[in-house]
């Protein structure tokens, strides 16, 4: 693995995928990447992704996403739209997000001031979440007006905080000579 591909990259600029246009993305790829305060990525067309870990649109650093088109993502751990660090995500009434596979996510949110307005449709085939968010996202910043997420699992799910373990002392383990070290990593 040498990296990932991006269909349209917009940092400190605006980008548009026009109607009748198609962006194809593969494994570990991103259809549209947008970053920078107030910069806008608009999708009126189609974004198709086939391959594990692919993302239709990735937004960060106070950028804005408006989806008026269709995002189709197929593979394990795929995401339709991912927003972080103050991104604003708008899935229009005409916006459709289809995610198929294991552990898929329609819209993923993380970071302070990240916001979502979902007026569109999120369809899930397989296992996953329509909308998932980390604890850093205020629930009041998530507005899902349609309630049309289709899938076998929850519509919204707050992902747990990752635990932090800090040892400021000593840890002594005496298990004799019958201890299996496989899979143990000490940092």
Question: Where do the model's predicted regions map?
Answer:
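General N-terminal targeting signals
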Residues: 133-135
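Beta-strand-rich solenoid/repeat architectures in extracellular/passenger domains
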Residues: 1-5, 14-28, 38-53, 64-77, ...
